[in-house]
Amino acid sequence: MPDEAIRHEDALESQAIAAVKGGDRNAYDYLVTKYMKRVMSVAWGIVRNAADAEDLAQEAFVKAFQSMDRFRSGEPFGPWIFRIVTNLSLDVMKHRTKFRDEELSGDEPAARRDSASLPATTSEIGARIDQAIESLPQMQRVVARLFLVEGFEHFEIASMTALSEGTIRSHLSLARKKLREQLADIYGGDDE
């Protein structure tokens, strides 16, 4: 039964957390193994660089390990580690923002795309979608990636970013509107 499997996973996670809090450093390996791919994916979705995403994931796990005494027992580890890596990734992006703004000044993202020819393959469509998401303002881009690509719920994204659920919904709504406009040739226009 899926519910039993989930309860078993939750119990293993709780045991690992208790063991780490009790001084067993090896128990932390379970948490790293369970969450590393998704943590790296969250980081990559924000910083868009594989090496940086790997560094940020490692930094997030180190930071979480060093702060385990403050972690509330009985709470799931996932949202906590995702919040840590999101905050670290956003910090990296804040430092990059001024350079990116200078690089993109005066150019409209829509002007760079070739709207005369439709993408021929699924990978080209995926690349167009990825490019459209990348062109969004930072918080819209982060929220869109976490919701649309990573599949996090509004409340989870709110927890990770320290924004309200209403703000998350607003960023997501604006992002969707801009994506519909940029991808109108793929998805049938902007008459929605």
Language-model features: where?
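Structural recognition of an alpha-helix C-terminal capping motif at a helix-to-coil junction
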Residues: 55-62, 75-87
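Internal acidic/polar
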Residues: 1, 5-13, 98-126, 153
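Short, charged helix-capping/linker segments at alpha-helix termini
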Residues: 3-5, 21-30, 40-59, 165, ...
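Short helix-capping/turn signature of helix-turn-helix
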Residues: 34-37, 45-48, 145-152
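Helix-turn-helix DNA-binding module
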Residues: 131-134, 138-142, 146, 150-167, ...
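Arg/Lys-rich amphipathic alpha helix in sigma70-family domain 2
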Residues: 66-73, 83-103, 122, 174
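Sigma70-family region 2
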Residues: 21-22, 48, 61-76, 95-97, ...
